[in-house]
Amino acid sequence: QVEAAAAGSRAVRFLPFRPAEQVPYVLAAGDLHVVTVKPGLEGVVVPSKLYGILAAGRPVLAIAPEESDVVRIVRRTGCGVAADPREPEAVAEAVRSLARDPERLAHMGRRAREIAHEYDRVSQLEKFVQVVEEAGRR
C-alpha cells in the first residue's frame, strides 16, 4: 500500500533489502530519513535505524508523538525536525519546508554526525555500566 501511494513520485524511492555491509552507503545516499514511532509506543521503542542515520550524518524527519525519545533527540540536538503522526498536513509541511531549504537540511545532517558518538554502542555501554555501578552502591 505504501509503495502504491508513492507510485509515480520522483522524490520517493523504495530500495530492496541490502546486505549489512552496504547499509552505511544506503543511509548516506538519502537527503532525509524518516523515523516513525506509532502513537502509544512512545517511551517503549526507539527505532534502531536512528543511530545509523546519525552516524551517516543525514537529517531526520521524526514522525512520532511529541513524548517519544526520537522527538526528544531530534529537538535537543537539532539533527532534524518532528511532526505528529496524527497530523498528516504537518508531516507534509515539514517535508516541503526542508525541500525549500537545502542549507538547513545540510546543517541538520552535520549536527547528526556531530552527535552520533553520543549514541554509539561504546557510549551506550559506558552509560549502562555507570547506571549499574551507581545502583550497586545504593
Which sequence ranges carry the predicted segments?
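Nucleotide-activated donor-binding/catalytic signature segment of Leloir-type glycosyltransferases, i.e.
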Residues: Q1-P24
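A short, well-ordered alpha-helix in the C-terminal region of glycosyltransferases
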Residues: A90, S97, R104-E118
